[in-house]
Regions:
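C-terminal end segment of the histidine kinase catalytic
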Residues: 90-101
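ATP phosphate-binding glycine-rich loop and adjacent ATP-lid/helix-beta elements
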Residues: 55-81
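Conserved short strand/loop->alpha-helix "switch" segment adjacent to the catalytic nucleotide/phosphoryl-transfer site
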Residues: 1-17, 21-31
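Short beta-strand element(s) in the Bergerat
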Residues: 41-45, 86
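Acidic ATP/Mg2+-coordinating residue in the GHKL
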Residues: 49
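Short beta-strand/loop element within the Bergerat-fold HATPase_c
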Residues: 31-41
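Glycine-rich nucleotide-binding loop
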Residues: 31, 53, 82-89
Length: 101
């Protein structure tokens, strides 16, 4: 992954961690599972918590920023209620130029 996409991915990860801290555990400490995997020409970033669940993408600044950053990656983000907890999965191409080949 190139440096620009890595920075964008880091910003998304940071915002997902902040959101989990704020909403899943109401500002208290709690466990998070973070995985980054690769398959073919795509990567998948997953952030999951064991919090109260039921929370999804909001309409606040952080959620809007995540949406904008995901668009920059030409990716897709999915929210899945684990009851309890939430799993957020981001998928995108590692190298978007591979579409042009």
């Amino acid at each position: 992954i190139d440096a620009g996409r890595a920075v964008t991915l880091g910003l998304i990860l940071t915002e997902l961690i902040i959101n989990a801290q704020k909403y899943a555990y109401d500002g208290r400490p709690g466990p998070l599972r973070i995985t980054l995997s690769e398959s073919d020409d795509r990567f998948r970033l997953v952030v999951a918590d064991d919090g109260k669940g039921g929370h999804k993408a909001g309409k606040g600044f952080g959620s809007m920023m995540i949406g904008s950053l995901v668009t920059q990656l030409d990716g897709r983000i999915d929210y899945r209620d684990l009851a309890p907890g939430l799993e957020v999965a981001l998928r995108a191409r590692i190298d978007p130029a591979s579409d042009l080949a």
